[in-house]
Amino acid sequence: IGGINCAKKAPLPADLQEFVDGSGDAGFIVFTLGSMVSTMPAEKAKQFFDAFRQIPQRVLWRYTGELPDDLPKNIKVMKWLPQNDLLAHPKIKVFMTHGGTHGIYEGICNGVPMLMFPLFGDQGDNVHRLVARGVAEKLSMLDVTTETLLAALKKIINDKSYKERMETLSSIHLDRPLQPLELATFWTEFVM
């Protein structure tokens, strides 16, 4: 049931809270490609590191690959992220994701525009739907460059319509007579 994973939000660990609170007006970006993809070829990772070093936003990246010797100070790399808790923070600007169902519902629930990199399965369809609604942009992991990544991030951050449309989509999604867990319970009991 869409959004069942959105209800509970926990306080961030102290180091993450300090990192995101210290992002100032520029805010921060969350980047994760889901639980199945936590690394990428070094050449591709370099393009992401090069792009991130050029933006004022801080970046929280779920990544287990090799780090550059000159890791930019605006990037915090972690093996695991409390994704929903971070997406609920008021300074979040963009959610960079592969477009898995779990993650997109967390992004929608929290009203966060997305930059999406579909990799397999239903992700392509999920991404297509959000791009069509004007709340996300799509890049191909195979073709992305430092320049295309920078352009997409700047577009989403600077064009306020992405955030406005996502907040509208979020309010529609959250406006329901039963919360997702209540709905699941109702239908489970109904069929029994």
Regions found by a protein language model. Give the residues of each.
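Catalytic core of nucleotide-sugar-dependent glycosyltransferases
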Residues: I1-M192
